[in-house]
From Swiss-Prot:
A GO CC annotation given for this chain: cytosol
Protein's name in the database: Formate-dependent phosphoribosylglycinamide formyltransferase
GO molecular function: ATP binding; magnesium ion binding; phosphoribosylglycinamide formyltransferase 2 activity; phosphoribosylglycinamide formyltransferase activity
Family per similarity comment: Belongs to the PurK/PurT family.
Binding site for Mg(2+): 258, 270
Pathway annotation: Purine metabolism; IMP biosynthesis via de novo pathway; N(2)-formyl-N(1)-(5-phospho-D-ribosyl)glycinamide from N(1)-(5-phospho-D-ribosyl)glycinamide (formate route): step 1/1
Record: residues binding N(1)-(5-phospho-beta-D-ribosyl)glycinamide: 12-13, 72, 277, 347, 354-355
Length: 387
């Protein structure tokens, strides 16, 4: 079985998915808005177009005639995906999932209003005046996010009236596509944030990975660890909520479902219909198949063995500190750490805080995952990707 897969978005998550697909003999055409993106470096073919250009997407599909389209980013003209699906092309996990998750309004309203899941209180705004009114409605402190963005771009916490103008400007600078709108969320005093990787199958039950804990900074993940302790009743509720929202979206593939966790409560936060950045910890061998291999198997309809914890692990990001062409230093020191591994993504240009790689540390059964985080952070600190 050899499928031609059109990958829309070619970042580090797409690169690992492409490697997984290559290992099972699949053909990948990697698409991104710039040449030399990480997944393009390991794909059979590459294309450089704006995925918000519907005519350009139509031309790509006509040229390559893919069996499967796998979105890796949100900034896609999703109405075209619905048209391709109607023509018989498999869209992963489904065109409906891509359309609902390309902006936070659709997925939040689905979760909170249609499915009745517990979420933070929220309001929307598309002008500075409406934004000020939304903040007054929700109250301070609150969290502001563009309706369409990725990797934490444009997200901030507003704690005082004097922060409003800067928060609006920052959100507009971080938005993707042509949607100029924000969601204002109640600030929940959570104890931790978790990702529940959820695998849906065309034939077979929905599967769940052991919960992943993570820490955010500037709205973007900095470290993740697996497993994260969750009281059994709250884990059962997280699985119920993840199952409900993924069933509503349909299709087959992996979803990264995020939750806020407090002592005795859990809230649905966000969802990505693809491998999740915090799930890169699974590259440390924490489970029998990493998240990219799980995604591929679900996409192709291949058997998936029980997902169990093999060993605890942790990840820590390696960030750029300057601009220009990247030079990698410090690998020898980093890889001298027992149980450590490093993935350099191969992004061709630097900008401050851009994610250029990830440090991975695997432990032995029974090791404290949070102690592994400290080791992963130390490994990441030994690596520099600078001019």
């Amino acid at each position: 079985m050899r499928k031609k897969i059109l990958l829309l978005g070619s970042g580090e998550l797409g690169k690992e998915f492409t490697i997984a697909a290559q290992r099972l003999g699949q053909e990948i055409i990697a698409v991104d808005a710039y040449d030399g993106a990480p997944a393009q470096q390991v794909a059979h073919a590459r294309e450089v177009v704006s995925m918000l250009d519907g005519a350009a997407l139509d031309a790509l599909v006509a040229k390559h005639r893919p069996d499967v389209i796998v979105p890796e980013i949100e900034a896609i003209r999703t109405e075209r995906l619905q048209a391709y699906e109607a023509q018989g092309v498999q869209v992963v996990p489904s065109a409906r999932a891509a359309a609902f998750t390309m902006n936070r309004r659709a997925i939040r309203d689905l979760a909170a209003r249609e499915l009745g899941l517990a979420t933070a209180r929220y309001a929307y705004a598309s002008t500075p005046e409406a934004f000020r009114a939304a903040v007054h409605e929700i109250g301070l402190p609150c969290v502001v996010k563009p309706l369409m963005s990725s990797s934490g771009k444009g997200q901030s916490v507003v704690r005082a009236e004097g922060d409003l103008e800067a928060a609006w400007a920052y959100a507009m600078s971080g938005t993707r596509g042509d949607l100029r709108e924000v969601i204002v969320e109640e600030f929940i005093p959570f104890d931790s944030e978790i990702t529940l990787l959820t695998v849906t199958q065309r034939r077979g039950e929905t599967l769940f990975c052991p919960p992943i804990g993570h820490r955010q900074e500037r709205g973007d993940y900095q470290e993740s660890w697996q497993p994260h302790p969750v009281p059994p009743p709250l884990l059962e509720e997280a699985r119920r909520m993840a199952g409900a929202v993924t069933r509503a979206l349909g299709g087959a593939g992996i979803f990264g479902v995020e939750f806020f966790l407090a002592k005795d409560r859990i809230w649905f936060s966000e969802l990505s219909p693809r491998p999740h950045d915090t799930g890169m910890v699974t590259l440390a061998g924490t489970q029998p198949l990493n998240e990219f291999e799980l995604h591929l198997r679900a996409v192709l309809g291949l058997p998936i063995p029980p997902i169990t914890l093999v060993r605890p692990g942790a990840s820590a990001v390696i960030l750029a500190r300057g601009t220009g062409a990247p030079v990698v230093r410090g690998l020898e020191s980093a890889l001298a750490e027992p149980g450590a591994d490093v993935r350099i993504f191969g992004k061709p240009a630097l900008r401050p805080h851009r994610r250029m790689g990830v440090a991975l540390v695997s432990g032995a059964p029974g090791d404290d995952p949070r102690a592994l985080v400290e080791r992963a952070r130390a490994v990441a600190a030994r690596v520099s990707v600078d001019p």
